[in-house]
Amino acid sequence: MLQENAPAESESDTNSTPARAAWSTENVNVETRALLDRDSNAFLHQSVSTPCLTAIKKAEGIYIEDVGGRRYIDFHGNNVHHIGYGHPRLKRAISEQMDALPFAPRRFTCEPAVQLAEKLAAITPGNLSKVLFTTGGSDAIEVAIKVARAATGRFKTLSFWDAFHGAGFGAASVGGEALFRGKPHGPLMPGAEHVAPFGSFNCPYGGRNAQESGDACARMIDYVLTREGDFAAFIAEPIRAVPYVPPPGFWRKVREACDRTGTLLIFDEIPTGLGKTGRMFSCEHDGVTPDILVLGKGLGGGILPIAAAVCRPELDVGGAWAFGHYTHEKNPVTTRAALETIQIIEDEGLVENAARVGQCALERLESWKDRFTEVVDVRGRGFLMGIELAGNDDKRPAKAIAERTLYNALENGLSFKTTMGNVLTLTPPLVTSQAQMDQALDILETALAAARNA
């Protein structure tokens, strides 16, 4: 029997609030309602999924279009739409590969799979050069945990509360969101320990600013790793996708603590890798190379699911065992899609675009602090941005205003998500132009103004 009071959703907007019901009543037509009802009858219900918001029939470039004909700029996209939806080059490459070689069964390799592994070794930082492919980021996290256990002879992990690393059993265990590890899931993976994350506003360590928070968090990680001394890995996103930007020196301190205690450092770049933060990999901002780097989401170009764990060669110690023997591990179509996606990102200068347009966007968002007292923090890098809303006097999260802003924006053609209930989180495709960004922020500014005055 499940508890009646479910945990507050932190991964995205809720699907059971009065605001969602009101939006559906006013914005869902008869045709869409029929499809939503069929969806509700066919799928298991779960938070932030079924029951769904609406139904879409088209996705192209930075836009999605619902069954009723409303078009949205998609600044959510589950972080898969780096090159925009339906990129012509990607669709052509997939079609060609399906004609040439649609599948590679177990025991066989193929040219696209090897090329992708070599490409990832070439573009990832440091000497990361040994790869395993999976069909999703959660599975790639599982592979990373297994490799870390095998290489160190240890089983314990350390990670952040409030982090998301996937919905699989091991990934949910190292994650820190109640939605994915709460009461109905039962006992999770043994040895998965957590510390409070760094922050800036309402820091769990009591820091007055981002630097103080980061310093306190780094000391706590150092303390736990040293005190127990037997962790296989510390697992984290190099920039928390809420988002929170690590203060200068934070990851160098963590890297030093890991090295001193024999703990492997695993960076989860599933949402941030391949240019999202204005660098090919988010960890490059901080000059720290992990022992294992995990990729997913945008790697398949927003069409096909593929993820990867990229490791130091010294971690290739389990040749007699199976760490990631997946049916589609070396699928020629998904690996060809990933190769083409990376090539498009490089050819079209999309990493540089995210850095340039993202910086302009962050400067504009920062100016909102002067207009909106509820905007207490603006943070991000490149095309990963967060606007935190809270009461000006009591600093309590302004969740109602955030939710109203979300639905106001949807009504006017902008889709994004809220995280932790009060952070407006924008993750645009890397192909977003300055003009498109300006249009999206115009919609968001109007939506926020209306929400706070409601």
What are these regions (language model features)?
Residues 2-454:
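Conserved N-terminal phosphate-binding loop of PLP-dependent enzymes in the Aspartate aminotransferase
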